[in-house]
């Protein structure tokens, strides 16, 4: 994939970013990539990893836990970590 054909990392969904990251890891593990290209795809992999971590963190912040009253009836929601 040429530089102009690579989608911007920030615009990728979590699933697409992970799939591309897995592809990069597989290519690097095979060891048949030239040094310059290895460095280039490694750097893209780092950007993909950071993007995935950001998306996961945002998802964790949105997850809520249902708060129950003493009778076990739903009474509202609170952050999953109790903060």
UniProtKB/Swiss-Prot annotation:
**One GO cellular component from the entry?**
exodeoxyribonuclease VII complex
InterPro entries the UniProt entry points to: Exonuc_VII_S, Exonuc_VII_ssu_sf
Gene Ontology BP, a term = DNA catabolic process
Q: Which reaction does it catalyse?
A: Exonucleolytic cleavage in either 5'- to 3'- or 3'- to 5'-direction to yield nucleoside 5'-phosphates
Q: Which family does it belong to?
A: Belongs to the XseB family.
**How is the quaternary structure described?**
Heterooligomer composed of large and small subunits.
Which NCBIfam families does the UniProt record give?
A: PRK00977.1-3, xseB
State the name under which the record lists this protein: Exodeoxyribonuclease 7 small subunit
Q: Which organism is it from?
A: Rhizobium etli (strain CIAT 652)
